[in-house]
Amino acid sequence: MIVDGRVSKIVLASIKNNIYKVFITVNSPIKFIAGQFVMVTINGKKCPFSIANCPTKNHEIELHIGSSNKDCSLDIIEYFVDALVEEVAIELDAPHGNAWLRSESNNPLLLIAGGTGLSYINSILTNCLNRNIPQDIYLYWGVKNSSLLYEDEELLELSLNNKNLHYIPVIEDKSEEWIGKKGTVLDAVMEDFTDLAHFDIYVCGPFMMAKTAKEKLIEEKKAKSEQMFADAFAYV
């Protein structure tokens, strides 16, 4: 489904690391399932972005974008800023992706996010909490350092208000003073679980992280391939 939209707001989620939340109001509601993504036409090229919001808010699309020093990342942010300032319409194509939330399942959930891969996880998490599902939800969010945990306070509050949500942030910088877990997000998962046979597992982050997660969790933690979901798995 192709619709037009307008950038309604851009929020700088992390000043130090240039992480942005982009909100796009669409002319026609987009029907999608939590965990799917949207293609945005940028300078003539279609670029995929995970939809960060819950499907019940289908009149507005939320994207999380990390702006590194790479030219492509900077160009993307510049495009959205220009669209906001100039109030021009942008083209969106959605929904896409097969790593959507299997809401009919009663299995506990393991959500693994790397960096701004949290956007994909956020849509799934919000949907689950809105439906008041009873099963446990384990959210592991891995970043290089704590300054990249741009949704940390919000997730901590959610975990306090929802007893079935277990939020575990993980940082890779072992030199940083940090009370929580250190290392890679996959290391933390491997350390905390012995048997994932009855879990539904959702993964989003760098391609190699997703690839390694699928291999190791199946081989060493009894995870079932048919209960693991990530857009990256289509290329593994």
Swiss-Prot record:
Highest rank taxon of the organism: Bacteria
FAD-binding FR-type domain residues: 1-102
UniProt GO BP: bioluminescence
Gene3D superfamilies in the cross-refs: Nucleotide-binding domain of ferredoxin-NADP reductase (FNR) module, Translation factors
Residues reported in the UniProt entry to bind pyridine: 114-118
GO molecular function: oxidoreductase activity
EC number(s) given by UniProt: 1.-.-.-
InterPro entries tied to this protein: FAD-bd_FR_type, FNR_nucleotide-bd, MRET, OxRdtase_FAD/NAD-bd, Riboflavin_synthase-like_b-brl
Broadest EC class assigned to this enzyme: oxidoreductase
Keywords, comma-separated and alphabetical: FAD, Flavoprotein, Luminescence, Oxidoreductase
Similarity section: Belongs to the Fre/LuxG FAD/NAD(P) flavoprotein oxidoreductase family.
Purpose: Probable flavin reductase in the luminescent systems of different marine bacteria.
Name by which UniProt lists this protein: Probable flavin reductase
Organism: Aliivibrio fischeri (Vibrio fischeri)
Lineage: Bacteria, Pseudomonadati, Pseudomonadota, Gammaproteobacteria, Vibrionales
Gene: luxG
